[in-house]
């Protein structure tokens, strides 16, 4: 069985380190575990980079910078990160090249793969949820109940201004996630309880 973990980085951040611990544990069990990232900093031969040349790296960096321009049409009192995942990437092509039996999603933000592209993965999928982004609009954490009740005009956080970006992103997830079967694994009981309440999962 060949497993492919998808995440933005193999080193930076707690989510990346957790992904690599899982990967290395599987290798210790003689399971064919592989990792695909945008930011490869280790020399692990089982870790592949989606940015293998100057052009791919430039496009990846440009998409991240472009996504940050949301500040010009959306603002929120929620101090946690908001991620878009709306720009197409080369990840589906890279997945086909590696040809795994199972996909394990981890922290896939920074425009690593788009919401729509996730729905086009045609292999059994596990999603190891590191935060609330998969069940929300663009938020990585929220106190709002919109992820349970749906993102409506009347229940928008009064601390948000401008275009309702979270509603638009949530609508994209409803469209593309609902018919894309996957097994959900949460890193904590708290997150698991949140996910069980989610409209999306």
Where are these regions (language model features)?
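N-terminal subdomain of nucleotide-sugar transferases
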Residues: 1-51, 98, 121-123
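Short hydrophobic segments within beta-strands
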Residues: 6, 36, 128, 185-187
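Short beta->alpha connector loops
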Residues: 9-11, 107-111, 190
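Short aromatic-enriched loop/helix-cap "lid" or pocket-rim segments at secondary-structure transitions
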Residues: 17-18, 44-50, 117, 137-142, ...
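A conserved catalytic-core segment of Leloir-type glycosyltransferases
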Residues: 28-29, 34-99
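Short N-terminal targeting/anchoring amphipathic segment
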Residues: 92-112, 123-130
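Membrane-proximal helix-turn-helix segments that form the acceptor-binding/catalytic region
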Residues: 93, 120, 133, 145-184, ...
